[in-house]
Amino acid sequence: IVTDAHARLLTARDVLNRAEQAVGLRARDDVEHAQTGTSPVLLGPAVRSELIRLLIDVCPSEGWIGVCGVGDIGWEWASQQGMDLDRVLVLNAGKDHQVGDLCSLLIEACDVVCLDVPELSSAQQRTLAARARSMGRIIVTLRPWPGLSRDGVRQRMRLVV
């Protein structure tokens, strides 16, 4: 279902993309994926409205967002902000499931994966980060991954010229 707001958002993104290309600006996605040695793991904000904005901002147009273990998203508000809910996969993994394997599948299927999974070990976190880096994916985690996660809000505010 395409709402008027969503259609306007897509039109605006298309116009901005053409304007950026006309003046020689590179898309944020092109620059971030071109950087080497940076972690693909962002520490997401606790405030849900900021988290939704971050997910929308780091997801490429026509990209997919995967969510696992994150509660109280506020899907209606997310849709109003421009998140295409037809391109969102949600996994609610129980404690009996192989959570690391499920997160790995989300990384294979989605451009941006948002995780709030306390069951992941440090080794699983490193494996998921390496897989995300090799596939050009971004992980937004709501729990710090020592040595891997970086502040997502601060990264998003960087200007690319």
What label would you give each PLM region?
Residues 60-64, 85-86, 132-139:
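Structural alpha-beta junctions
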Residues 45-46, 70, 117, 143:
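Fold-independent oxyanion-binding glycine-rich loops
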Residues 57, 105, 131:
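Hydrophobic/aromatic ligand-binding patch that stacks against planar heteroaromatic rings
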